[in-house]
Amino acid sequence: MHNIHRRNFLKAAGAATAGLVTANIALNAYASSVAPKPQAGKSVIGLIAPKMDVVRVGFIGVGERGFSHVEQFCHLEGVELKAICDTHQAVLDRAVDHIVKQNRPKPAVYTGNDLSYRDLLSRDDIDIVIISTPWEWHAPMAIETMESGKHAFVEVPMALTVEECWQVVDTAERTQKNCMMMENVNYGREELMVLNMVRQGVFGELLHGEAAYIHELRWQMKEIDHKTGSWRTYWHTKRNGNLYPTHGLGPVSQYMNINRGDRFDYLTSMSSPALGRALYAKREFPADHERNQLKYINGDINTSLIKTVKGRTIMVQHDTTTPRPYSRHNLIQGTNGVFAGFPNRIAVENGGFGQSYHEWDMDMQKWYDKYDHPLWQRIGKEAEINGGHGGMDFVMLWRMIYCLRNGEALDQDVYDGASWSVVNILSEHSLNDRSNSVTFPDFTRGAWQTAKPLGIVGA
């Protein structure tokens, strides 16, 4: 009996030791991914590409989001739409038809398999590539785009692991090519106005921000074979964290000059139970349907808190499951006042229009009149006509092409894309460790300390 107990004890002790070793290996792997790696090339902060009289564009992915970009590019001057790629013939045909109807030359078409995009990348008459594919393809395609000598413009998120983030950063530095994650919300009218107000000191010294992606998308679960829900639904069965942080976080980061005088230091994260998607599947699908066989593990509501090196705080939330109105929060609080979105409202102690800071001022027109961003003043009406999330898509693409044609640095660089995207992964790490804090990698390798703040750009 004694020997049996001893054997069981030794077996348990061995299992515990193995568990500790496994945990230490995982911890060491995470620590090594956080530590700055040897620089692969020169920093691309402020990278300016040689001027392009005409920007020649290739598109990888022209389905839901990609087709929207095709539509917007047809309204831009100084661009040629050279080639498009997708695995679905129907969306390719739609994109080609639209381009031709806009009196533009018919683009080359690439399809056939998941790697057909490499044929597009092999062309020598393309300057930039717009990547609008499922998330898992973003980093690999961006890396191959830069390695082919082209600038990469990739949809959100830029990458799905810490290692992928580093690989994209390293490739940009080694090739000296732009990799911009196309965070369109940074170009919304309100976001640009608030950026202008922040730079003019309206809110005083910044203290705290709140960002979110609150967008009920359960209906996408009914997209089974094609469209976004056909692949996005499965991420709710693979991860528990903030799956989609950048729409709210991008603008708040620019307000705070993240990677340009401050940077994210550490994060802690919590998730609610994951209930809503299983309930929706039970209500909307037959019992034997695939959607009812999935195990949904991503908490319906995730809340993460970020601390910056300068001590500022940012709350970031994700909720695409519960029935509630859309919101990105878009709150920025300073020593002199606050702006909050959804609905837009302002309260300031000094420098306002006479209203007490104990009450919200929701009359935005006078604030627009005084602080509208120069970009929106220049092309806002054109953006509203051409559409794209209220015009922000058009402003983003217009600004991208303007910078490339005029030899200016882009407003968002690879370090921004990595820093905003990595919240996805770090929130998961924190949740798996009882919401203990996790450290952000410094993708700039210290260059954030001397990088110039993002200015109020004109046009």
Swiss-Prot record:
Gene Ontology molecular function, alphabetical: hydrolase activity, acting on glycosyl bonds; nucleotide binding
Binding annotation for substrate: 213, 232, 244-247, 326
Signal peptide (from-to): 1-31
Origin superkingdom: Bacteria
Keywords carried by this UniProt record: Glycosidase, Hydrolase, NAD, Signal
Binding site for NAD(+): 64-65, 86, 135-138, 155-156, 184, 244
Record keyword S-adenosyl-L-methionine present: no
Pfam family, one: TAT_signal
Record text on cofactor binding: Binds 1 NAD(+) per subunit. The NAD(+) cannot dissociate.
Post-translational note: Predicted to be exported by the Tat system. The position of the signal peptide cleavage has not been experimentally proven.
Cofactor: NAD(+)
EC number: 3.2.1.-
Family that this chain belongs to: Belongs to the Gfo/Idh/MocA family. Glycosyl hydrolase 109 subfamily.
Function: Glycosidase.
Protein name: Glycosyl hydrolase family 109 protein
Species per Swiss-Prot/TrEMBL record: Shewanella baltica (strain OS155 / ATCC BAA-1091)
